Amino acid sequence: MHLGNLHQTIEMPGQNKHKKVAMKVNTMAEMIASGQTPEVLFWVGCAGSFDQRAQKITKAFATILDKAGVNYAILGKEEACTGDPARRAGNEFMFQMMAYQNIQILNGYSIKKIVTTCPHCFNILKNEYPALGGNYEVIHHTQFLQELIEQGKIKITDSNEWKGKSITYHDSCYLGRANEIYEAPRKVLESLDMELREMKRCKSKGLCCGAGGAQMFKEEEKGDKRVNMERADEAIETNSDFVASACPFCNTMLTDGIKNRNEEVNTEVLDIAEMIAKAMQ
């Protein structure tokens, strides 16, 4: 089973659903059939499955898990969209259909611990699934990376390519304000020995990238300036070599904003997992 080979997803215009992440990872069904119980379920998410840019984040995180010796699995074709965009858009019926389907599968496998690279999936699995009978320990990948680093399972090379470079970090709304996870991503970046330059609006006062609350899937509203352009400008103002994100949607919005300003040569947007994967021994 390949990462991203999901049964159901959000389909964006022009999206090729047949382009998968070519990386072999065990599914829950395969592991249970062989009498194994994984330590953690990696919830890939729609973006991480079908968006070509986000697939790189998925591969990077899976590579880290493999190198760190984590016993994990994915759902594969059994993973459907969490229903987050449906609920944010006001389609409660659709959300509950999707959520109950996922919960039935998760509970059927007696899942206890879930890790995901998507703050949207993280937030809804952690905070909204319990009301429907889905009770799990849900952690974001930056939290898991911090744990693995502290446990010595992730070792960073002294000569990693990020060392001495400057970076600014964008706080995802669902990770930051919604769940108050500010330090884990920054602690992980500290391990790379980079210079962290905070944007003028950060942490609890951070500005949305423009994709939150299902805004990524609707037409823009009239205004003087696109939200992602405003945020990209704040990132560019820090004169950092890199912009780190911890959300596939934020990554897309910031990348588009920086390209629009013709700054992609000077400032590259990367997920924290991509940076750690390259820096590992």
Regions found by a protein language model. Name each.
Residues 1-79, 83-117, 122-129, 148:
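Iron-sulfur-cluster electron-transfer modules
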Residues 44-49, 77-90, 115-124, 170-178, ...:
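Local cysteine-cluster metal-coordination motifs and their immediate loop/turn environment
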Residues 50-57, 148-149, 173-191:
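Active-site glycine- and acidic-residue-rich loops that bind
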Residues 59-71, 182-195:
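Short helix-loop-beta junction
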Residues 92-94, 126-127, 180-181, 185, ...:
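Iron-sulfur (Fe-S) cluster-binding segments and ferredoxin-like electron-carrier domains
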Residues 132-161, 201-204, 262-281:
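Short, flexible loop segments at boundaries between secondary-structure elements
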Residues 139-144, 150, 163-178, 195:
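Catalytic cores of enzyme domains
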Residues 222-241:
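A short, acidic, amphipathic alpha-helical segment used as a generic capping/interface helix at domain edges
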